[in-house]
């Protein structure tokens, strides 16, 4: 598989010689008014759908993953034995796990954020220091949500709070 050419976020796990990148969208979409963007059928075709795991030292891609829906921020677990990260998708409102198992990297969708039909648009994510919870702030509905990720393969929403009309 080939990466789609968009770059957005990057995280590194130096202990695993890995760098991970997401592919939200290109500059033109990023700078466009959101209302105009959502109504522009051509612009809506210009979103990324890949996450790339790179060799950190050589800066060469090791594996390209299909992560449909425009992956945004990447956050990695803090624990020294926790070789996994999360990303969320802007257009499909999914939580994706990027994880290492038996020295191979994999991805899987592990949770849904709000009502995807309403495009909540997750814009900020954070993992708690104990790697047990993932905070997700969503732009379009002004919500903050907390997911229990003590089992990273099964994110469960445990808290929701309205912050405002838009975050």
Residue ranges and their predicted role:
Residues 2-3, 61-70, 106-120, 159-167:
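Surface-exposed loop and turn segments in beta-propeller and other repeat-based domains
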Residues 15-17, 81-83, 130-132:
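Short coil/turn segments that connect the beta-strands within blades of beta-propeller domains
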Residues 21-46:
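Short, conserved, GDST-rich strand-edge loop motifs in beta-rich repeat architectures
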């Amino acid at each position: 598989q080939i990466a789609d050419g968009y770059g957005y976020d990057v995280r590194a796990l130096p202990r695993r010689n890995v760098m991970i990148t997401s592919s939200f969208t290109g500059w033109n979409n990023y700078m466009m008014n959101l209302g105009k963007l959502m109504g522009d059928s051509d612009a809506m075709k210009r979103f990324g759908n890949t996450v790339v795991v790179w060799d950190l030292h050589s800066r060469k891609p090791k594996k390209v993953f299909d992560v449909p829906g425009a992956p945004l921020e990447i956050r990695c677990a803090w624990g020294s034995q926790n070789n996994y990260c999360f990303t969320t998708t802007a257009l499909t409102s999914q939580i994706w796990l990027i994880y290492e198992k038996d020295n191979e990297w994999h991805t899987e969708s592990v949770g849904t954020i709000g009502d995807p039909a309403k495009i909540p648009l997750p814009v900020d994510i954070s993992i708690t220091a104990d790697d047990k919870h993932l905070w997700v702030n969503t732009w379009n509905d002004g919500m903050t949500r907390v997911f229990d990720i003590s089992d990273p393969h099964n994110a469960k929403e445990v808290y929701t709070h309205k912050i405002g009309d838009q975050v």
